[in-house]
Amino acid sequence: MSSALLAATALELAVLAGHLIAYPFGLTPERPERRPPPRSPAPPTGTGADGPDGGEAAVHAATARGEAHPATALPVATAVAPPVVLLHGFIDNRSVFVVLRRALTRRGHRHLESLNYSPLTRDIRTAAELLGRHVEEICARTGHSRVDVVGHSLGGLIARYYVQRLGGDRRVRTLVTLGTPHGGTAVAPGAGIHPIVRQMRGGSSVIEELRGPAPGCRTRFVSFWSELDQVMVPVRTACVDHPDLDAVNVRVTGIGHVALPVHPTVAAAIREALEAPEATEDNPEDTAEHTANAAGSSPGATSAA
């Protein structure tokens, strides 16, 4: 076992131990707040991560199509931020996003909402319908016409199904996925007893549906994948690879699957992705590769993936 994998495994265990303590506090659904649309966020203060670094990590971004181009910093938006919906992974809950919520709040994202779906949910399609109803309720309550979504692992797959198969692209501006098995994973513990786990395997009916055409999809995808993610097999299955989707794949080094939603380096890169301006005719989206320089408090190098 390499030293990098040993360090990442140790960090995974530490994160898991901390999450087990926080887990009970996320079991109950959060109470939605009725707020007016937020004001424009404060001017950006830099790209460093918030809070202490739990281990050295670097993130590298590459578009899902095309060759490498010179790396540039991810742009930061100045427009009013839409609500952000956080969607946890399998048998998890909203407590996994404590660090990310703090990072986004400090940046000026005032409207953050988490959705807990039941661990007894047996079908990704059913969970995607639940997400759709939740998004519609948020839009009606806040006056926003669109939202951003961040999904960890299975949560990202649920959100992608909503966007790509249930018309959710009219509501979701940006979908950020963290360690999500977009192409299906060979590691599926519990597949024999839980049907939703079987749907995450390569070749499942859900995965095949997502391979289908998606012309005109209006959602921008940003997928974070880690070369040390032992739940995603192969690791690049966590990348979005679809000719019809506007996608940027971000490579994370030094951490594994469990640490993705809680590591401050990743939180800073997610924050930048959510603050990127939407493409317009006057400001076409740059399809070149980007490098998110968010090495946190410990040294780290970034380069185009």
Give the residues covered by each predicted segment.
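Flexible, membrane-associating and regulatory peripheral segments of lipid-active enzymes
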Residues: 1-85, 98, 102, 107, ...
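Short alpha-helix in the alpha/beta-hydrolase fold that links the catalytic acid
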Residues: 100, 233-240
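Acidic catalytic loop of the alpha/beta-hydrolase fold
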Residues: 227-233, 257-258
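Catalytic histidine-centered segment of alpha/beta-hydrolase-like enzymes
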Residues: 124, 256-264
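Short, proline-enriched alpha-helix->beta-strand connector loops that line the catalytic pocket
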Residues: 80-82, 215-221, 244-248
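Serine-dependent carboxylesterase/thioesterase catalytic core
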Residues: 84-95, 101-218, 224-225, 231, ...
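Post-His helix in hydrolase/transferase enzymes
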Residues: 261-273
